């Protein structure tokens, strides 16, 4: 259930143990009348992972075998691969650090603090348990993830109190500063390929065709529309005594044709990375018809999309690899931007952090629902009977009454009917059959038979909810709860006709200054009466 974060923050600050221990009150209890089965329905793939999976399939279609390359690379490997370029490469890598294990001393004063937190005295056995477990932690025999649990089990005390003890009694833990190691996060997929090929060269025959699609990390000064600190590289290698740059061209064309690219240009890369053989480092440009005339910087249809080259013997020999190796790589996010015509990589990869967020009409429509639903079969039957009666007789002249349903619900025998007593009107108002649509960000209740709203009906996103649907279900639920009259007159907002707008959709619509318009004469009265 929904809770107030500010109130919980205050409670947590005052007494973490109590706030945490009682946080279960915010979790709804299972309702035996509800069906919690998760049914198959269309989901939505992220552009990056959609592209990533298609790249995996594309490589497999070309006969490549998928591998997982090491993601943690020793600094020494960078020097082996890049030689005197290594320092420039290392300037852009992330070194891995960790917190040292503190040498914790425990005085009588600290034991007194612990007793105050635990609310009980510590036995000699308890004190020895604390000393022993902290000593094992220092020696690395207990992992940080297990420290609280082991202390909790050893002392027979709630783990939340142990967490408070560590925070309050042992400031050494909070004063720790990370110590850097000589291990790095992979900045080039190439770093992993040398290690992988070095391990496989004596076990596999050539030609050996491998690929990997995975994360790489660069210590960029800042992220921008074209560059992120963490991104996915789709990389492949062919190890073969007779491999040439023509293999690189063939792989590039075979791979990218599967994504709609139809023409290719190959240009020497000015970077001349030292892990490639001189004059083999090639940039790949592809022409994609969908980009021609697009509102992007690729409007001429051409885009730089990949790079390939032949690994140098100077680098390969460091791993005892005696064969030339062609390597091709491309950025998954870059390809995803092209295929989805995105203008900013940050917004495409992390849409949840966009200052200017966007919802499609269909996404908003999925956030519109009926406010109430009957919980019994009889209630459901009542709702369906109300809807059927209005569909048949909604325009009947008044005064009029139409019996809808008769039966027993919750042990009471009742009769349900629709009624309009006033003369010169109809059983229901003209807006009773209006349906909720989302069009260009507006949420509208429209009559589908009115030509004025033909464009909305044709191009908008339907919610599938008519006024009568929501009202009938609400009336049925009211009857289940013993409320025997549901009357709606003029509608001005969704809530007037028991239509619910998710708070996210409401914030979006209001924030974008779109409108919600459910105005219309509904004028319907649904009643129930007890019968003998």
Curated annotation (Swiss-Prot):
Its EC number is 6.1.1.27. Coiled coil: none annotated. The keyword Cytoplasm does not apply. InterPro entries: aa-tRNA-synth_II, aa-tRNA-synth_II/BPL/LPL, O-Pseryl-tRNA(Cys)_ligase, Phenylalanyl-tRNA_Synthase, SepRS_C. Substrate binds at residues 188-190, 233-235, 275-276, 327. Keywords: Aminoacyl-tRNA synthetase, ATP-binding, Ligase, Nucleotide-binding, Protein biosynthesis. PROSITE patterns: AA_TRNA_LIGASE_II. It catalyses: tRNA(Cys) + O-phospho-L-serine + ATP = O-phospho-L-seryl-tRNA(Cys) + AMP + diphosphate. It is an enzyme of class 6 (ligase). GO terms for molecular function: ATP binding; phosphoserine-tRNA(Cys) ligase activity; tRNA binding. SUPFAM superfamilies: Class II aaRS and biotin synthetases (SSF55681). GO terms for biological process: translation; tRNA aminoacylation. It holds the Pfam family SepRS_C. Belongs to the class-II aminoacyl-tRNA synthetase family. O-phosphoseryl-tRNA(Cys) synthetase subfamily. Catalyzes the attachment of O-phosphoserine (Sep) to tRNA(Cys). Homotetramer. Interacts with SepCysS. This is O-phosphoserine--tRNA(Cys) ligase.
């Amino acid at each position: 259930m929904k809770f107030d974060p500010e109130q919980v923050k205050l409670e947590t600050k005052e007494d973490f143990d109590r706030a945490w221990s009682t946080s279960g009150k915010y979790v709804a209890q299972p309702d035996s009348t509800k069906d919690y089965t998760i049914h198959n329905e269309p989901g939505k793939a992220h552009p990056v992972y959609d592209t990533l999976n298609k790249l995996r399939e594309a490589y497999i279609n070309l006969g490549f075998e998928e591998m997982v390359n090491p993601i943690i690379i020793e600094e020494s490997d960078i020097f082996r691969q890049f030689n005197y370029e290594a320092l420039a490469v290392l300037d852009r890598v992330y070194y891995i650090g960790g917190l040292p294990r503190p040498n914790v001393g425990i005085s009588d004063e600290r034991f007194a603090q612990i007793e105050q937190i635990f609310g009980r005295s510590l036995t000699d056995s308890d004190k020895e348990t604390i000393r022993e477990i902290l000593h094992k932690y220092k020696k690395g025999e207990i992992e940080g993830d297990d420290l609280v649990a082991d202390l909790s089990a050893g002392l027979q005390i709630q783990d939340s109190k142990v967490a408070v003890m560590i925070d309050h009694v042992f400031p050494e833990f909070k004063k720790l500063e990370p110590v850097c190691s000589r291990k790095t996060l992979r900045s080039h997929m190439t770093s992993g390929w040398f290690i992988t090929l070095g391990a496989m060269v004596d076990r596999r025959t050539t030609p050996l065709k491998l690929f990997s699609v995975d994360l790489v990390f660069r210590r960029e000064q800042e992220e921008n529309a074209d560059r992120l600190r963490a991104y996915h590289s789709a990389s492949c290698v062919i190890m073969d005594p007779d491999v040439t740059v023509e293999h690189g061209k063939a792989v590039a064309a075979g791979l990218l044709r599967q994504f709609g690219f139809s023409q290719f240009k190959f240009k020497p890369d000015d970077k001349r990375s030292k892990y490639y053989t001189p004059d083999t480092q090639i940039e790949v440009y592809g022409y994609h018809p969908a980009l021609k005339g697009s509102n992007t910087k690729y409007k001429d249809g051409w885009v730089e999309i990949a790079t390939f080259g032949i690994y140098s013997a100077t680098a390969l020999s460091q791993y005892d690899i005696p064969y030339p190796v062609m390597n091709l790589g491309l950025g998954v996010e870059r390809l995803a931007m092209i295929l989805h015509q995105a203008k900013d990589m940050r917004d495409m990869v992390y849409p949840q952090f966009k200052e200017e967020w966007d919802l499609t009409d269909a996404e908003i429509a999925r956030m519109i629902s009926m406010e109430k639903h009957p919980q019994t079969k009889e209630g459901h039957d009542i709702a369906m009977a109300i809807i059927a009666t209005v569909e048949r007789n909604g325009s009947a002249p008044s005064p009029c009454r139409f019996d809808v349903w008769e039966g027993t619900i919750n042990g009471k025998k009742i009769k349900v009917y629709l009624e309009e007593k006033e003369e010169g009107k109809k059983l229901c108002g003209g807006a009773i059959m209006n349906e909720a649509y989302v069009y260009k960000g507006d949420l509208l209740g429209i009559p589908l038979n009115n030509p004025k709203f033909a464009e909305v009906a044709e191009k908008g996103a339907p919610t599938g909810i008519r006024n009568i649907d929501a009202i009938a279900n609400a009336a049925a639920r009211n009857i289940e709860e013993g409320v025997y009259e549901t009357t709606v007159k003029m509608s001005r907002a969704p809530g007037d006709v028991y239509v619910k707008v998710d708070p996210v959709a409401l914030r979006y619509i209001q924030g974008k200054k779109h409108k919600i318009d459910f105005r219309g004469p509904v004028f319907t009265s649904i009643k129930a009466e007890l019968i003998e």
